[in-house]
């Protein structure tokens, strides 16, 4: 490859690293072209799987500010550049590797953090981002409902207290009216007639 072509390839790969939420490095030795095509289909639209040259990709990673991958650029390497959900891509790679043991996950970088192959496997065991967000929203809704109940309880207690005071005053004034009339009648009876 001529120098201008290498420079262009490095720039393209560096841009892939910058635009990706994750980049997973794999060894693809022993996979057929049809298996690689199937893997690309498995990863879907949120990822691009590319066979790369180690030296050029190492330089591109450095240019993109991606660190911690130097030891992974050994042997035949392909990179899954993920622009979508990293968990879904990790699941796709894990499932494909189970069916095709020739695919070996070496490691990668997820949202700027270098990860080992074991960490990528653990990432694949997580639930998808959408499911985790739904669970978080459900937990927050339950917490908010509880908080609303806590805030509403004192208000309803104040309303019940105000109603009880109003009823008590009404019954006191009703009880005081006959007593006041009886007192006036008694005073009138005791008073000498002129």
Swiss-Prot record:
<dbReference type="Pfam" id="PF00466">
    <property type="entry name" value="Ribosomal_L10"/>
</dbReference>
<dbReference type="InterPro" id="IPR001790">
    <property type="entry name" value="Ribosomal_uL10"/>
</dbReference>
<dbReference type="InterPro" id="IPR047865">
    <property type="entry name" value="Ribosomal_uL10_bac_type"/>
</dbReference>
<dbReference type="GO" id="GO:0003735">
    <property type="term" value="F:structural constituent of ribosome"/>
</dbReference>
<keyword id="KW-0694">RNA-binding</keyword>
<dbReference type="GO" id="GO:0015934">
    <property type="term" value="C:large ribosomal subunit"/>
</dbReference>
<dbReference type="InterPro" id="IPR002363">
    <property type="entry name" value="Ribosomal_uL10_CS_bac"/>
</dbReference>
<feature type="compositionally biased region" description="Low complexity">
    <location>
        <begin position="174"/>
        <end position="194"/>
    </location>
</feature>
<dbReference type="GO" id="GO:0070180">
    <property type="term" value="F:large ribosomal subunit rRNA binding"/>
</dbReference>
<keyword id="KW-0699">rRNA-binding</keyword>
<comment type="subunit">
    <text>Part of the ribosomal stalk of the 50S ribosomal subunit. The N-terminus interacts with L11 and the large rRNA to form the base of the stalk. The C-terminus forms an elongated spine to which L12 dimers bind in a sequential fashion forming a multimeric L10(L12)X complex.</text>
</comment>
<dbReference type="GO" id="GO:0006412">
    <property type="term" value="P:translation"/>
</dbReference>
<dbReference type="InterPro" id="IPR022973">
    <property type="entry name" value="Ribosomal_uL10_bac"/>
</dbReference>
<dbReference type="InterPro" id="IPR043141">
    <property type="entry name" value="Ribosomal_uL10-like_sf"/>
</dbReference>
<keyword id="KW-0687">Ribonucleoprotein</keyword>
<feature type="region of interest" description="Disordered">
    <location>
        <begin position="167"/>
        <end position="194"/>
    </location>
</feature>
<keyword id="KW-0689">Ribosomal protein</keyword>
<protein>
    <recommendedName>
        <fullName>Large ribosomal subunit protein uL10</fullName>
    </recommendedName>
</protein>
<comment type="similarity">
    <text>Belongs to the universal ribosomal protein uL10 family.</text>
</comment>
<comment type="function">
    <text>Forms part of the ribosomal stalk, playing a central role in the interaction of the ribosome with GTP-bound translation factors.</text>
</comment>
